[in-house]
């Protein structure tokens, strides 16, 4: 089996989740690759989006944009958002990458590749299993307009929120956010931990 994990460089949480998934799969002898989705289009695009994201998280701008996204997502007819439209533009490039590398399944840890994968599924270009792993503790704006096989969410207490937003209940799997267990099982003396935290 060969799995593709699609991420984006918009905050390290998505990439950390992707790395944890890769480690877990490789321990089970599953071949797994991580790909920055936007870098398939161009490294420059990936850098620009990453820089725009980092800039948007300064001050209250991110919160404002997030709230606007939530409002718009709740009001639009699904599959008509500009987010879906933009990510649909590189769907063919993504399809060729998946086909050429013979992946058996795709896991998305970011909304952008989930939107592109949705476009591929709607056009019946892709018939392999697709998964979304939520890295936030809420249903993010525009997620309900995606159409993947399963949505892995952080906790069962969030099921109703995702259902109310439009994610089909039968597709929700509440098993948590993947983390690298080695980082949380290695004991570090308190003095060393304090020193590491103050150096950050």
Each model region followed by its residue ranges:
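Extreme N-terminal starter segment of soluble prokaryotic enzymes
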Residues: 1-4
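A short, glycine/small-residue-rich beta-strand->loop->alpha-helix junction that serves as a flexible
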Residues: 8-19
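Conserved N-terminal ligand/cofactor-binding loop architecture of enzyme catalytic domains
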Residues: 20-99
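Glycine-rich phosphate-binding loop signature in dinucleotide/nucleotide-binding domains
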Residues: 97-103, 199
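A conserved, positively charged/aromatic
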Residues: 98, 125, 141-151
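Structural motif
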Residues: 104-105, 150
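Active-site proximal beta-strand in glycosyltransferases
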Residues: 105-114, 118-136
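A nucleotide-sugar donor-handling region in carbohydrate enzymes
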Residues: 149-200
């Amino acid at each position: 089996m060969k799995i593709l994990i699609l991420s984006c460089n918009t905050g390290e949480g998505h990439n950390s989740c992707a790395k944890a998934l890769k480690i877990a799969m490789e321990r089970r002898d599953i071949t797994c690759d991580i790909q920055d989705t936007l870098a398939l289009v161009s490294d420059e695009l990936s850098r620009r989006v990453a820089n725009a994201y980092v800039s948007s998280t300064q001050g209250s701008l991110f919160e404002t944009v997030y709230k606007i996204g939530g409002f718009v997502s709740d009001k639009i007819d699904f599959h008509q958002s500009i987010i879906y439209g933009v990510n649909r533009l590189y769907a063919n490039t993504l399809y060729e990458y998946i086909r050429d590398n013979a992946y058996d399944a795709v896991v998305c840890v970011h909304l952008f590749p989930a939107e592109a994968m949705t476009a591929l599924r709607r056009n019946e270009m892709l018939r392999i299993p697709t998964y979304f792993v939520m890295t936030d503790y809420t249903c993010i704006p525009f997620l309900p307009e995606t159409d993947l096989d399963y949505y892995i969410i952080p906790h069962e207490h969030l099921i109703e929120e995702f259902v109310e937003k439009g994610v089909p209940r039968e597709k929700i799997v509440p098993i948590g956010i993947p983390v690298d267990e080695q980082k949380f099982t290695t004991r570090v003396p308190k003095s060393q931990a304090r020193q590491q935290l103050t150096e950050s």
